[in-house]
């Protein structure tokens, strides 16, 4: 009898502590941007708040899995889906690169929209991942910066990707890159990627540098990912150009931001709606872009970010207004026209 009891205790203990090859995603926090952003060395003392929203991600144990199965807005993801095969340390590092790029784009868009001078310089692309079938596996590493392909430089990662996609399968390709401050080059082959296009098999994101006379400082240690771009941009614009724009309201939202002010899709938006509603937000900005053809073919019932956010809001019966946006200007216009 004692042995049975002890075994039961051991199993219970293991259920809570032994990690499985899965992660769980839960509603995270909805934080006041003033905690992590300072613009022009001036405090934002206006009533209300802009909030950026996070999704909580952690290694799953058996106990976590049971909790996730029983709890709304809690998802189970495989380790491959979540980290792309990267270690936890690499995964956090990758998300910090996303955050850095997001902050630079937010500075650029926020100040540019406010009519301030700012220069955005494209330095290349950070290497985030290298696929197992890439001929650059073992050569390129996370945080290396690709600066040229076949001795050609580019003005954006899109231009680089388009060029590489245009090469023929099996073609030789020369990649110039920076590693630990040293310029190096390596040759490999064009391969077929998972999406059927030609490429070199690396995950990447823009590496940029911004220069402005307006000091902007972020304090986001321990926070990663690109999804706060819209709200960072909006906060910068407001403090510089229109301090009363939010008019005392708590305004939350999510979405990436690019150099043209477009708002990009993000993951886990249903959980972000839940987190924002818990913190009393009156407005939630959601990206409103069409579902891609590939996604529509794979999942005919797929919804875009805005539709998913609306559905989540209805489920939790919140009065928070879900507002669709495609650009930073859409968000600004909504706040101006709905004071």
Predicted segments with their positions:
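Hydrophobic membrane-insertion alpha-helices, especially the h-region
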Residues: 1-19
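Extended, small/polar residue-biased N-terminal targeting/export presequences
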Residues: 33, 48-52, 57-122
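Second-shell loop/turn segments in exported
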Residues: 88-101, 130-132, 148-150, 216-226, ...
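Terminal peptide-recognition signature
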Residues: 111, 136, 143-146, 150, ...
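PDZ-domain C-terminal substructure recognizer with occasional recognition of PDZ-binding tails
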Residues: 114, 161-204, 309-330, 334-339
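PDZ/PDZ-like groove recognition
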Residues: 114-142
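Conserved PDZ fold ligand-binding element
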Residues: 136-159, 276, 280-293
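C-terminal, low-ordered peptide segments at domain boundaries
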Residues: 180-234
């Amino acid at each position: 009898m004692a042995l049975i009891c002890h075994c039961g205790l051991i199993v219970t203990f293991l259920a809570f502590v032994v990690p499985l090859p899965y992660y769980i995603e839960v509603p995270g926090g909805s934080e006041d941007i003033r905690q992590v952003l300072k613009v022009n060395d001036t405090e934002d003392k206006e009533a209300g708040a802009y909030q950026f929203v996070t999704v909580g991600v952690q290694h799953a144990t058996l106990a976590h899995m049971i909790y996730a199965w029983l709890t709304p807005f809690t998802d189970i993801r495989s380790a491959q889906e979540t980290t792309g095969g990267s270690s936890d340390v690499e995964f956090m590092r990758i998300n910090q690169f996303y955050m850095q790029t997001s902050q630079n784009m937010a500075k650029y868009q926020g100040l540019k929209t406010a009519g301030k001078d700012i220069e955005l310089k494209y330095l290349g692309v950070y290497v985030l991942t290298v696929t197992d079938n890439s001929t650059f596996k073992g050569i390129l590493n996370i945080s290396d910066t690709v600066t040229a392909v076949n001795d050609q430089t580019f003005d954006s990662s899109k231009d680089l990707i388009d060029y590489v996609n245009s090469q023929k399968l099996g073609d030789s390709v020369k990649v110039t890159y920076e590693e630990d401050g040293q310029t190096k080059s390596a040759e490999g082959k064009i391969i077929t990627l998972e999406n059927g296009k030609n490429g070199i098999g690396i995950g990447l994101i823009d590496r940029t540098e911004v220069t402005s006379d307006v000091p902007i400082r972020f304090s986001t240690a321990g926070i990663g990912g690109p999804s706060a771009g819209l709200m960072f941009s909006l906060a910068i614009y407001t403090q510089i150009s229109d301090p009363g724009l939010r008019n005392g309201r708590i305004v939350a939202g999510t979405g990436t931001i690019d150099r043209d002010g477009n708002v990009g899709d993000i993951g886990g938006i249903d959980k972000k709606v839940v987190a924002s509603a818990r913190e009393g937000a009156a407005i939630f900005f959601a990206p409103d872009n069409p579902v891609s053809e590939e996604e529509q073919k794979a999942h005919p019932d797929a919804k875009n970010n805005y539709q998913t956010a609306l559905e989540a809001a209805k489920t939790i019966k919140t009065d928070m207004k879900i507002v669709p946006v495609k650009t930073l200007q859409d968000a600004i216009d909504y706040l101006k026209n709905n004071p």
